[in-house]
Amino acid sequence: MEEIIKPVSKELLKAELTEDRRLRMTNKSNNQIYIITHQNAPNVMREIGRLREIAFRAAGGGTGLSMDIDEYDTMEHPYKQLIVWNPEAEEILGGYRYLLGTDVRFDEAGAPILATSHMFHFSDAFIKEYLPQTIELGRSFVTLEYQSTRAGSKGLFALDNLWDGLGALTVVMPNVKYFFGKVTMYPSYHRRGRDMILYFLKKHFNDREELVTPMEPLILETSDEELRTLFCKDTFKEDYKILNTEIRKLGYNIPPLVNAYMSLSPTMRMFGTAINYEFGDVEETGILIAVDEILEDKRIRHIQTFIESHPDALKMPCESEGVFTPKVVTPQEGCCH
């Protein structure tokens, strides 16, 4: 396990966080969203790598290297880094990395070069019909000091701030129809609790088209019969109550991102779970969320607010009319919002 690098100078960070790289202000806490790459902001990238490694190690994952920066961050056409910057404290409080489907390159075998390609197989239907309109998200993190269990009020809106950034992306890139990402669970999480969560997700969000499948699917340790007996209700709400109660009995909580993604859209697709052997053996569950099926309150909070404050963002030489009109979507009652 390598020693993590020292913090990058705030002056170096501020010099690279220029106005042309600023996307928006957040709805809460008056923080700023920036988009950078390794090439145009190498010092910010080093600080992101440092903060990611600290956060992931604390949760039981990480690379074990001095900072979490890989070839997908540094390649010729790299993943972009979306970060939340606290201008008052002059520090990064969280981030995602992302790649537009239209920017994806393919290897000699015709497989997409994605950070998840070593864990998941992407069907021809996904590559042709979904990928060109998809943003792949990864490496989501909240800096340790801003995680709500440690930070109190200042960490309360960290994840909310990040989603303000993702909401803005759907405005400035109106061809984007889907977010493809992963829910990460760590080996330290209770095994039976993990099995209950994954069974619940499969029951209510399973992708029957097999658009994306894990190359080595995770095998649950709890019997299918036991889980089927436990989650025997007809509705999401009733099964969710069971899940929440059983997880609490174990002395755990449902991971915040699991709750957060379920509360974004009732039509989320779950693609199964694979072990990421390159990242501390964490367990990665693939998911897909359709932008126009995000629940209205979330759409207004993270997308509509950006449109109202940045009307020029819609004045672009592509058809954006109707892009933000969501389908009629009924919330999953009983989920944590």
UniProtKB/Swiss-Prot annotation:
Signal sequence region: none
Keywords: Acyltransferase, Lipid biosynthesis, Lipid metabolism, Transferase
Transmembrane parts of this sequence: none
UniProt KW Membrane keyword: no
Induction line: Is constitutively expressed.
Function of the protein: Is involved in the production of glycine lipids (GL), which are phosphorus-free membrane lipids important for fitness during growth of the human gut bacterium B.thetaiotaomicron in vivo and in vitro. Catalyzes the first step of GL biosynthesis, i.e. the N-acylation of glycine via addition of a 3-hydroxy fatty acyl group, to form a range of monoacylated glycine (also named lyso-glycine lipids or lyso-GL). Is important for the ability of B.thetaiotaomicron to adapt to stress and colonize the mammalian gut.
Entry protein name: Glycine N(alpha)-acyltransferase
Organism phylogeny: Bacteria, Pseudomonadati, Bacteroidota, Bacteroidia, Bacteroidales
